[in-house]
Amino acid sequence: MKTRELILKLFDEAYEKKTWHGPNLKQSIRGVSAKQAAWRPGAERHNIWEETLHAAYWKYTVRRGIEGGKRGSFALKGSNFFPRPEKGRENEAAWSADRKLLEREHRALRKTIEAVVDTPRGRKFLRKIYGVAFHDVYHAGQIRLLRRLMGH
């Protein structure tokens, strides 16, 4: 298998394609309600909603690095973890909007990876590219654990 094929396969499996290791990131948030996404296992602990946006942010960060984009251009103000739900927005529409942000950032990064993976610039970023796939799998596992802890 060529590097291009392997990288795209890893990237796709970590987010949405069938895998041998269990649910990927997209499968892990499927069927989760806003109320469930907002549940915390304890004070000062992240919830599913925050983990979802965290994954979106790091997809953006890797893409921005590859493209040489401007810092601070993420759709949300802040970085890394975003407190959710926002006061007065503890609803399905807000949760759906944030899931769509994850999807958009994933699609944008995949498009960038496809364009550069075979170039010298792409090779320079290979570690971050496969790293973001591992990051998705890591957080998919956290989300699955949170779902079990809440009995879902």
Locations of regions flagged by a protein language model:
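Short, contiguous alpha-helical
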Residues: 2-4, 8-22, 26-29, 34-82, ...
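Acidic/histidine-rich alpha-helical segments that form the ligand environment
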Residues: 83-120, 127-132
